[in-house]
């Protein structure tokens, strides 16, 4: 599974500005989804890879980013 890492309290994606390989995104993906996860910056959001099937990613149901 893949997807954008999401802030559970705001419903927003984690923003990033350095597209492609991004240490911040990689670190945040591993913190939230485990050491097997990968991550990079795609379309100014942190995109996480190698997630378990039940991983919660953006968008959250009934929670818009505000």
UniProtKB/Swiss-Prot annotation:
Protein name, entry field: Beta-mammal toxin Cv2
Primary location recorded for the protein, binned into one broad class: secreted
Family: Belongs to the long (4 C-C) scorpion toxin superfamily. Sodium channel inhibitor family. Beta subfamily.
Entry's free-text remark on domains: Has the structural arrangement of an alpha-helix connected to antiparallel beta-sheets by disulfide bonds (CS-alpha/beta).
GO molecular function: sodium channel inhibitor activity; toxin activity
Activity regulation (record text): Is susceptible to be slightly neutralized by human antibodies scFvs 10FG2.
Organism: Centruroides villegasi
Keyword field: Disulfide bond, Ion channel impairing toxin, Neurotoxin, Secreted, Toxin, Voltage-gated sodium channel impairing toxin
GO BP annotations, alphabetical order: defense response
Primary role: Beta toxins bind voltage-independently at site-4 of sodium channels (Nav) and reduces peak current and shifts the voltage of activation toward more negative potentials thereby affecting sodium channel activation and promoting spontaneous and repetitive firing. This toxin is slightly toxic to mice.
């Amino acid at each position: 599974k893949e997807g954008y890492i999401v802030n559970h309290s705001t419903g927003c994606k984690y923003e990033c500005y350095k597209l492609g390989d991004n240490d911040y995104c990689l670190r945040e993906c591993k913190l939230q989804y485990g050491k097997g996860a990968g991550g990079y910056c795609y379309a100014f959001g942190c995109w996480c890879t190698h997630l378990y099937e039940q991983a919660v990613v953006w968008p959250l149901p009934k929670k818009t980013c505000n």
